[in-house]
Amino acid sequence: VAHESSLLLSGFTLISGPCVLEDAGLNLEVAREVQRLAGDRGLDVIFKASFDKANRSRPGAARGPGLEKGLRLLAEVGAATGLPLLTDVHEPGQCARA
């Protein structure tokens, strides 16, 4: 069964990470675990996390570290793991920075 499941996953890229960026230590812990799990299965992986969760439905809910700090946190994950990075943007003006 393990052999069959690895054949089914062949050629897939896993995009994974926390919903929103947390503190640097937790981001790195998640990235390394995702990298390990993907590597064990022969998958490529892209680390994805948001710097701003603008779609929160509860007023005052935590939204993330913001653009500048979030990009720094993502860069730290990339530098430490070598993983490609992905985030989402909510406004056209954020694209140049991201």
Predicted regions and their residues:
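Short amphipathic alpha-helices and their capping/turn segments at secondary-structure boundaries
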Residues: 1-4, 27-43
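N-terminal amphipathic alpha-helix/helix-capping segment at the start of soluble metabolic enzymes
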Residues: 1-15
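Long, contiguous binding/interaction regions
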Residues: 19, 35-39, 83
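Short glycine- and Lys/Arg-enriched binding-loop motifs that mark or flank ligand-binding interfaces
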Residues: 13, 19, 60
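Short, well-ordered coil/turn segments that N-cap beta-strands
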Residues: 9-13, 41-45, 79-85
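Glycine-rich anion/phosphate-binding loops
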Residues: 21-33, 65-72
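Short beta-strands and strand-loop turn motifs
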Residues: 13-16, 48-50
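N-terminal active-site wall of soluble small-molecule enzyme domains
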Residues: 49-98
